[in-house]
Each structure stands twice: as structure tokens, then as C-alpha cells.
Amino acid sequence: MDIKAKEKDYLTAYRSLNAEERLNLMINNYSTFPKIIRKMEVKTRYRIKSEKEYMRSHLRGELGVRVQSSKLSDPTFEEASTNIMLDKAMETGEAEGGLLNGIENAERYEADIRIISIMRMDYELLSEIVEDLDEDESCWMKDFLTKRKLLKEIASERGLSYETMKRRAYELRNDIREEII
């Protein structure tokens, strides 16, 4: 299943896929998958921070213009602690420490954080498996997965037939599938 970044929200798509489909999605988007993960992380961070700021403003009764009040607060500390909690949540996949307290649709954000963490772990495993192939196979497999070279070009460089290269790519893909699934 090949899903283009512009066509669908990857979080929703990834959440609904089984392990085989997730692997195919990662392989088909190997070169752009880290960027996709980062984009989903940035979007989720932005939404959570915006929602938290809206809730803070709403609780203070602000109408959009900040007015100095006598209440002691430390917005820099609040921002820093939110960033630290978001970093930890994105790394572990768990939103803890009251990160999502008072936010509407907190369960959706929690699910998004969990999926982003899973996406990152899945991709790291795939990358590690490709790296652990012998040096020559790892090199041409990365060229093929990142779409820098076609199998015909790789076969030609190695003095092999296209069919032989295609068969070897298929075997490696199956080996990768067995290790991941």
C-alpha cells in the first residue's frame, strides 16, 4: 500500500495498517519516512501547545489581548516544562506528567503520540536491518530503496542480469519482512 504524504494523514493511515502493510509503507517511502515522522511530530506538538495555550488563556478569561495581572506566573517555565514533557512523550510514546490535562480530545493526542513513537521504532528497526546486511548488499539496497538507482542500473554496475538482481532484491525484502514481522 503506497500512500503519498499529500494524499492522506500518515497517522490515521499507519494506525489502521497491519504489520505487513506498515512494512510496505516504510519500504515504499524509505527515503522520506524520517521526514514524514518528523512532520507528524511537529504537527502534533504544535496542536498540543496551541490547545494548552488556548486553555490557559480561556481559564484566565483573556479575550486575546494579554494584560498584566497580579497573579504570579512563569510562562517561560511553563513553555520549557511543556517542551520537556513533549520530548519525553514523543520518545516513549506515553503522555505523562499532566501533559494533556484539560485538553479537548486528549485521547486523540495520546494515540497520535503513541503512533509517532511506534513509527519511529519501526523505521529504526528497518534501517538497522538494512545496515546489517553485508556491505555490498546494504549499499545497493539503500540505493534501490531511496530510489537513487533502478534495479537495472544496479544490475548493470555489478555485471548481473536484471532478473538476477530482481530475484535478489525480492529475497532481501523477504528476509527483512521475516525479521520485522
Go through the PLM ranges and name each one:
Residues 18, 114, 133, 160, ...:
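Conserved aromatic-histidine-acidic binding/catalytic patches
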Residues 42, 153, 161-163:
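Coiled-coil-like amphipathic alpha-helices with heptad-repeat character
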Residues 125-133, 175, 179:
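Generic non-transmembrane alpha-helical segments
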Residues 132-149:
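Short amphipathic alpha helix immediately N-terminal
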Residues 140-141, 153-156, 165:
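Hydrophobic positions on the alpha-helical face of helix-turn-helix-like DNA-binding modules
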Residues 146-159:
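Charge-enriched, short contiguous segments at helix-coil
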Residues 157-181:
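DNA-recognition helix of helix-turn-helix
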